[in-house]
Amino acid sequence: MVEKRTQPLARDAMAYVLAGGRGSRLKELTDRRAKPAVYFGGKARIIDFALSNALNSGIRRIGVATQYKAHSLIRHLQRGWNFFRPERNESFDILPASQRVSETQWYEGTADAVYQNIDIIEDHGVEYMVILAGDHVYKMDYELMLQQHVDSGADVTVGCLEVPRMEATGFGVMHVDNADRIIAFVEKPADPPGIPGNPDMALASMGIYVFHTKFLMDMLRRDAADPKSSRDFGKDIIPYIVEHGKAVAHRFTHSCVRSDFEREAYWRDVGTIDAYWQANIDLTHITPELDIYDSTWPIWTFSEIKPPAKFVHDDENRRGSATSSLVSGDCIISGAALNRSLLFTGVRVNSYSRLENAVVLPDVTIGRHSILRNVVIDSRVVIPEGLVVGDDPELDAKRFRRTESGVCLITQTMIDKLGM
């Protein structure tokens, strides 16, 4: 007889978010911040999606492991995620790489980032561990994954989704049987195996793992004692369990959270400039693929106390306006025109300028008579008067980071070199 559950499994779980990665494919956008700390969607940071999923799923104990250029990430977590209360049996731990196990080692891999804090985890006394990547954009109910983990009797449950086969080189790729038990797992293969019967697609790991806590601690201690291990979940821990235990796949379509008009299960890596730009610009559509307005599954973040956005001037050639755009608080659009653009907090766009398909990070100032198309502008950049981007591909490529699809990343260092 199956024991009846009296409370959600999430109440006896800890979410452990791996947030130490650089995200080198985002180029200069991660020169000063880790990928999980990169801004997204007008207000949030990328890490807020994994954290919000945990909170909305009912998890009240969260740990975040940080490493690469962590200052802005730690500051964001301290300001935006400081509402957990011990008296309510809640906790939020920020766990920077601090050589707690060895005086000579930082986090050596994803598994080591958990192992080095094993005493903190055990002090929480939770039954389940939900290991999360902090650098993906998606909405997911982890309670449903926890339920499958318990019901299946798995040693580990791995979140997965189908992706085009040749896009799976950056993920762990698995084969499963008819019951979704994982029978083979390879990390970041150069030639990913396709799904039987659907060879153009591969079943990719989302970097989400559910364990019973005691089993995970045993696995981490065994792995730490292995001199040949690379201390990584995808390379070491998961393949070992596939071979010696029971690993089960959890399909993202079974637990993704969708509002009424979200047609497909939405998950994005946003690991390249093109992918980052596209995911942000998609939010300007009438019915975007990701609904950030879904009040039943809010994306929690740090909300600054800022005045509303303001649009000024209404002359024939000098009108502050925005079409199909997201404009955050404390922005002033002074006689400029925006189309299909997303502006974060504190942006100033001065007269006679035009922005189209622009993603503008916080506290940017755009000078008069500027024309900016298909751009990502890093925070605190000052765009000089009369700058034109998006008309001359060769000139853009000489001055800025231009992708093959024509998106330009603009940083202050690049602007300074122009001498304008």
From Swiss-Prot:
Catalytic activity field: alpha-D-glucose 1-phosphate + ATP + H(+) = ADP-alpha-D-glucose + diphosphate
Matching SUPFAM superfamilies: Nucleotide-diphospho-sugar transferases, Trimeric LpxA-like enzymes
One GO-annotated biological process of the protein: glycogen biosynthetic process
Entry binding sites for alpha-D-glucose 1-phosphate: 107, 172, 187-188, 205
Enzyme class, first EC level, given as a word: transferase
InterPro entries: ADP-Glc_PPase (IPR011831), ADP_Glu_pyroP_CS (IPR005836), GlgC_bac (IPR023049), GlmU/GlgC-like_hexapep (IPR056818), NTP_transferase_dom (IPR005835), Nucleotide-diphossugar_trans (IPR029044), Trimer_LpxA-like_sf (IPR011004)
GO molecular function, one term: glucose-1-phosphate adenylyltransferase activity
EC number of the protein: 2.7.7.27
Keywords: ATP-binding, Carbohydrate metabolism, Glycogen biosynthesis, Glycogen metabolism, Nucleotide-binding, Nucleotidyltransferase, Transferase
Pathway: Glycan biosynthesis; glycogen biosynthesis
Keyword ATP-binding in record: yes
PROSITE patterns the record matches: ADP_GLC_PYROPHOSPH_1, ADP_GLC_PYROPHOSPH_2, ADP_GLC_PYROPHOSPH_3
Domain of life of the native organism: Bacteria
PANTHER family noted in UniProt: GLUCOSE-1-PHOSPHATE ADENYLYLTRANSFERASE, GLUCOSE-1-PHOSPHATE ADENYLYLTRANSFERASE-RELATED
Function per UniProt: Involved in the biosynthesis of ADP-glucose, a building block required for the elongation reactions to produce glycogen. Catalyzes the reaction between ATP and alpha-D-glucose 1-phosphate (G1P) to produce pyrophosphate and ADP-Glc.
Family designation: Belongs to the bacterial/plant glucose-1-phosphate adenylyltransferase family.
Subunit details: Homotetramer.
Alphabetical list of NCBIfam families matching this protein: glgC, PRK00725.1, PRK00844.1
Entry-linked HAMAP family: GlgC (MF_00624)
Listed name of the protein: Glucose-1-phosphate adenylyltransferase
Species per Swiss-Prot/TrEMBL record: Rhizobium meliloti (strain 1021)
